[in-house]
Curated annotation (Swiss-Prot):
Principal location: cytoplasm
UniProt-annotated stretches for the region Disordered: 163-185
Keyword Cytoplasm (UniProt): yes
Recorded GO MF terms: ribosomal large subunit binding
UniProt function note: Responsible for the release of ribosomes from messenger RNA at the termination of protein biosynthesis. May increase the efficiency of translation by recycling ribosomes from one round of translation to another.
Family matches, as PANTHER family: MITOCHONDRIAL RIBOSOME RECYCLING FACTOR PSEUDO 1, RIBOSOME RECYCLING FACTOR
Entry keyword set: Cytoplasm, Protein biosynthesis
Family: Belongs to the RRF family.
Descriptive protein name: Ribosome-recycling factor
Cell location: Cytoplasm
Length: 185
């Protein structure tokens, strides 16, 4: 796959998949997951610092996230950052660590989250389809400019379609896995 148009399409499709994984990782599914606090930044000595750089994040139980700061003086700053991050979970500070207890999800909330997962997956598919469309347009332009032959264009179009199908299958699998995680709780 030496064609730059194919490379660009593949890269864009992989970015859509990676973005979906990141987004779904931040959706609370009734289980403790360190990615819930990935986007939390703590004001630490005057600078905004990612939480995972100033504290160890562990999962001692299925529904408990344990945050142990490397510097005990940062405990209150971390707690404040968790409150302001609006992750939907109240931190419990016991003086040396912070516990985030993930509440059990109700059936109704599970359905809402599953719908949200579906919407995010559909957005990722739109990005994939846009990458496909852009690649097809670029192939047609290249053919009109006599940079590639008609046969090459058809072969490349087929490869772009295969990339699209592959990316869509991956997105569906990621989405199904997350929905399964949510419904099983």
């Amino acid at each position: 796959m030496a064609n730059p148009i194919l490379e660009q399409a593949k890269e864009n499709m992989e970015k859509a998949e990676a973005s979906l994984r990141r987004t779904l990782g931040q959706i609370r599914a009734g289980r403790a997951n360190a990615s819930l606090v990935n986007r939390v930044n703590v004001e630490y000595y005057g600078a905004m610092t990612p939480l995972n750089q100033i504290a160890a994040i562990t999962i001692p139980e299925a529904r408990v996230l344990l945050i142990t700061p490397y510097d005990k003086g940062a405990l209150e700053d971390i707690e404040k950052a968790l409150y302001t991050a609006d992750i939907g979970i109240s931190p419990a500070n016991d003086g040396s660590v912070i516990r985030l207890v993930i509440p059990q999800l109700t059936g109704e909330r599970r359905k809402e989250i599953a719908k949200e997962v579906g919407k995010e997956a559909e957005l990722a598919k739109v990005v994939v389809r846009n990458a496909r469309r852009d690649a097809m347009d670029n192939l047609k332009k290249a053919e009109k400019a006599s940079e590639i032959s008609e046969d090459e264009m058809h072969d490349l179009e087929e490869q772009v379609q295969n990339l699209t199908n592959e990316a869509t299958k991956k997105i569906d699998a990621i989405s199904k896995d997350k929905e399964k995680e949510i419904t099983e709780g």
